[in-house]
């Protein structure tokens, strides 16, 4: 199923939306690149939670939900026949958008014995000279595997050695993730080879508001903006203002949210135990990934 949060956003976020919507001068078209205030809010947020420094004028592109970023990135960097690495299991949109871009899809397996992480030996056996881009998603959906700096460092090194753009889809880093959330952009040299998408859908309970972001070096953000500006428009001003409010929320918000999710996790474990399913504790994100018993 879809990982759709059922909790409302923070009351202050909703209040900002309502207050701004009542103003008479906020209902026109907005800049494709997003409001300067929102880009600054994303930069501050990345610095606060991930210890990553980003230039809000050059390295941040707000999105109408991070899902659209998959399309924009694919169209910006993939030509017909280019290879793209897609995880299995993984988010189906990576493959469907790659087909729209007429790219050649190479799947790479995520295996429980390897902690649901890429097998770099398997990757090295692929025709990497034909591959332009690699989709990764950590914390992972649907397996719940958490991110690590060791993994991100390996991915950055892999991308550099083979001239492959690494794109980390990172909407789950604040959900059932007791450790400090991390970003691939923390890895040394990541800006040379990586992009990262993030979202307010999960960690801020704003799935229907459609607020996301892609971050990376200026040249790549400019390329993405070129495609985006020909496909959609800027977000509604009050939504951008409310997103600014949401991005300023502190640890208390995430603790309250995760207390609810951890309570549901406990109930899910009890149900899975009753059914005889096998699962691993300590997963992140909105899912519990489990193996059905024999006979089902």
Regions found by a protein language model. Give the residues of each.
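N-terminal small-domain helix-loop-helix segment of the aminotransferase-like
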Residues: 1-65, 72, 247-249
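Helix C-cap/helix->beta junction micro-motif
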Residues: 101, 161-162, 275
């Amino acid at each position: 199923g879809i990982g759709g949060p059922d909790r409302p956003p923070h009351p202050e976020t909703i209040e900002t939306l309502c207050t701004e919507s009542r103003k008479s001068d906020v209902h026109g078209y907005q800049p494709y690149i997003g409001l300067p205030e929102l880009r600054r809010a994303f930069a501050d947020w990345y610095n606060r939670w991930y210890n990553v420094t980003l230039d809000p004028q050059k390295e941040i592109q707000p999105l109408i939900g991070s899902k659209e970023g998959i399309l924009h990135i694919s169209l910006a960097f993939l030509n017909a026949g280019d290879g793209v690495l897609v995880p299995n299991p993984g988010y189906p949109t990576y493959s469907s958008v790659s087909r729209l871009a007429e790219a050649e899809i190479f799947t790479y397996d995520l295996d429980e014995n390897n902690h649901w992480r890429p097998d770099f030996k398997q990757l090295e056996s692929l025709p990497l000279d034909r591959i332009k881009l690699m989709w990764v998603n950590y914390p992972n959906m649907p397996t719940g595997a958490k991110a690590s700096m060791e993994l991100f460092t390996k991915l950055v090194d892999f991308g550099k050695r083979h001239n492959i753009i690494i794109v980390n889809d990172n909407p789950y880093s604040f959900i059932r993730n007791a450790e400090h959330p991390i970003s691939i952009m923390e890895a040394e040299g990541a800006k040379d080879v990586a992009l990262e998408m993030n979202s307010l859908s999960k960690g801020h309970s704003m799935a229907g508001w459609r607020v996301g972001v892609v971050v990376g070096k200026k040249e790549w953000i400019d390329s993405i903006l070129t495609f985006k500006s020909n496909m959609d428009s800027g977000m509604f001003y009050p939504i951008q203002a409310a997103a600014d409010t949401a991005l300023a929320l502190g640890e208390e918000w995430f603790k309250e949210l995760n207390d609810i999710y951890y309570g549901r996790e406990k109930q899910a474990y009890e149900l899975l135990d009753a059914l005889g399913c096998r699962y691993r504790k300590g997963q992140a994100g909105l899912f519990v990934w489990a193996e059905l018993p024999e006979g089902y």
